[in-house]
Amino acid sequence: MIKNIVLSGGAYLGLLEFGVLQYLNENLYYDISEIEKIYGTSIGGFIGAILCLKIDMKDVIEYITDRPWHNLISFSPSILSDFYSKKGFINKNICEIALSNLLRSVDLDTNITLKNFYEYSNIELHLYTISLGDFELKDLSYKTYPDLLLVDAIYMSCSVPYIFQPLNIEGEYYIDGGFICNYPISYCIKDNAKEDERFAIAFNNSGKTKHISEQNIFEFVYLIHNKLTQFTRQKNNNLNIKNEIIIDCDGLNLEDAHNLIFSKELRQSYIKRGYDFAE
């Protein structure tokens, strides 16, 4: 019986993870009521939080595909000044808005703390971020940061530099945990999760990507991110991971990200691709 789930970071590739989870849910591979711990970085943490809500997976998939995600990003006249002064052009509001409807559907709101979220779900959610001052990985959970807001924890784990404005908490900035731990399988193993009770989704995004000379600054940041995550993934190659799905995919790029934000059909195709991969 699966009791622990590990979800890799990967920006919009998280749609593939949704597809995998939908297939496995429909085929009773896991029962969310039996899950005890979820480990996720960046988009993996976002998906993990949604799983903790225990909403019917069909409703989740419908929400992810049908929502007009392009309305979440506002390109105001101040976007350039915000980029320079606030170190990014997307702020925490995007995380609050993305989660608000899902939270309200189970009578929760965006002010819920990690402790209260655990009391609701009875699932130990672990999210990973990096404190910029000492560049150390932080494990965000109800045990380590009980009073931290759920939306803050998710945003901290997703904050890719130059794109997301890093959250400042008590004088410390936090960025995407994927630069150190994009695939937190080792933390699941360290918590003594039994081999037959853990399941993990990872990405092999070593496929085609733009040449460096053709990349803009944001794609260049994602390239660095990809290279670091591949390096950290290699460190896990000697681990004994029985129930693991590794999805082959191309490197991240802004063109695909932009198209997915605006196209419902493309989001559906990514989810279906993950679904088919799990079969």
Positions of predicted regions on the chain:
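Patatin-like phospholipase
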Residues: 1-41, 46-279
